[in-house]
Amino acid sequence: METSYREEEARRKASLLHCIFFFLLGALAMAAAIAVLHESSYWEWRCNRLTDIVVDGDDGDGPSSSEVVDGGGEWGMVRTRGAQFVVGGGRPFYVNGFNTYWLMVLAVDPSTRGKVTEVFRQAAAVGLTVCRTWAFNDGGWRALQKSPGVYDEEVFKALDFVVSEARKHKIRLILPLINNWDDYGGKAQYVRWAQAAAAGAGADAFFSDETVRGYFKSHVTAVLTRVNAYTGVAYRDDPTIMAWELMNEPRCASDPTGDTLQAWIAEMAFHVKSVDPAHLLGVGAEGFYGPSSPPARLRVNPNADVALAGADFVRNHRVLGVDFASVHVYPDTWLPAGATKEAQLRFATSWVEAHIADAEGALGGMPVLFAEFGVSTRGARAAFNATSRDAFIEAVYGAMLRSTRRGGGGAGALLWQVFPEGTDYMDDGYAVVLPRAAATAGIVAAHSRRLQSFNSRCAWSCRWGCNKRDNDTAETTTAEADVDVSFHHEL
């Protein structure tokens, strides 16, 4: 009897211990799940999305024409955390975007203003989230800035309209502030205004002439502090604007050492941040490797001449105030004439991968945006047609996705360029008219869906795929954000 009693007592104790064990295990699992949900931005995102739907009056299936809710949610300012763009409470924001540079000019005329709305509507339909377009037109036809500090209010209102329409379609904007080239005025127009050319100075005097630099700083201030006539929101306070770019494709071939351009970038980055510390800032560079680059990187350049253009990818993006790296991809115009389609595809892939590696390594974990990529389907050099161009688009998207899947620095790419129907007279061979290019539109939409699957993930699940260095960088960035989120500290 005593033995049986002891055996029964032992069984009861074992059963009790099992119950306690499984209870504690369940409690730990529940605590971990609560911690994960608390850390993630999922519930914050859902709340913000539901608020958007209630306020906008849409059903969640597409963009609304009403005001977008701001605050710290889905439509707050885009920021950087480590090698990624983030929105809201830290939700990743991988970019699938496009260029349509002429939006402001067409918005001036009521008869063509509808093209702005049309291109945003078509872009949003395939999931494009960022548009890069000019915030300048210096001198000449429909000039925004007619002379130094003198602006055409109707053209400024046209830019206001572009920003307002982008907001309605939930498309963010990247706005370059001047052109390296003569189109839309560019740096040469500033030099002419300052009459520096009378002393034999070329367009590169833009970077060194004190009067010219003063003109440009005044223009920067005028644009950044502009109050939108449609929304009543100052540009520097508007989260519709994702980022400013100092210049479209800056080069200073008159000083191949790169020192002149480097000094200008540093000066202007400081000025932009002094006026608008809230928005991201990019250089607008093409990504050429210059004199400070190791031989292995110089060999990545498409030709030897670009190393003497005065630009220097890594050095230019180490400047205080520059928040992300920018690169362009044009194998058809950069590679030697006669380069085959296969050679151009290989170059595009290696060019993208090299810059992602440098953004993660040499730049200490900085997002890199491929702000222009495209090939022409016209002209004697064209190796692609409207159909085979899809292979180039897929090559760039593929390189981006490989980075995205591992939590790398490839933050997005913007196709050059999306046109609505009825604008063929402006097409130089690079235009993609989405309604007439079903296969291309399908590729773009599929890439948008893939990126959205990453953008919709909670912050913790994105970090799960990153290596420890990226996590440490993200934590450091978060800690520093309370002090100053406006500057990427020079290495």
From Swiss-Prot:
Signal peptide: 1-31
Reaction(s) catalysed by this chain's protein: Random hydrolysis of (1->4)-beta-D-mannosidic linkages in mannans, galactomannans and glucomannans
UniProt keyword terms in alphabetical order: Glycoprotein, Glycosidase, Hydrolase, Secreted, Signal
Highest taxon above the source species: Eukaryota
Keyword RNA-binding attributed: no
Expressing tissues: Expression not detected.
Protein's name in the database: Putative mannan endo-1,4-beta-mannosidase 5
SUPFAM superfamilies for this protein: (Trans)glycosidases
UniProt EC number: 3.2.1.78
UniProt binding sites for substrate: W134, N248, Y330, W416
One Pfam assignment: Cellulase
